[in-house]
């Protein structure tokens, strides 16, 4: 019984620690890697097939398992 209680407390503690460690600011969570569409430098988005809205992207090109999005004025 004490082993089950210990595992339960371990899971609850890890969930609390993970939620407290998660950054709330979008700029902290956005760690884009540079990519190139021809000679234009953009930001690579993994597992997306089109650019996300609200970031000012005007063009994109397909990359391996994602998309490279670039703004109007790079």
Swiss-Prot record:
Belongs to the sea anemone type 3 (BDS) potassium channel toxin family. The keyword Cytoplasm does not apply. GO terms for cellular component: extracellular region; nematocyst. Potently and selectively inhibits voltage-gated potassium channels Kv11/KCNH/ERG. Acts as a gating-modifier toxin that shifts the voltage-dependence of ERG activation in the positive direction and suppresses its current amplitudes elicited by strong depolarizing pulses that maximally activate the channels. Residues 22-29 form a propeptide. It is found in: Secreted; Nematocyst. It comes from the Eukaryota. Residues 1-21 form the signal peptide. Its main location: secreted. One of its GO terms (molecular function) is potassium channel regulator activity. Keywords: Cleavage on pair of basic residues, Disulfide bond, Ion channel impairing toxin, Nematocyst, Neurotoxin, Potassium channel impairing toxin, Secreted, Signal, Toxin, Voltage-gated potassium channel impairing toxin. This is U-actitoxin-Bgr3a.
């Amino acid at each position: 019984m004490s082993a089950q209680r210990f595992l339960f407390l371990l899971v609850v503690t890890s969930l609390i620690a993970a939620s407290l460690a998660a950054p709330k600011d979008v700029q902290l969570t956005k760690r884009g890697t540079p990519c190139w569409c021809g000679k234009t430098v953009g930001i690579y988005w993994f597992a997306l097939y089109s650019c996300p809205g609200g970031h000012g992207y005007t063009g994109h090109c397909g990359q391996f398992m994602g998309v490279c999005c670039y703004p109007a004025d790079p």
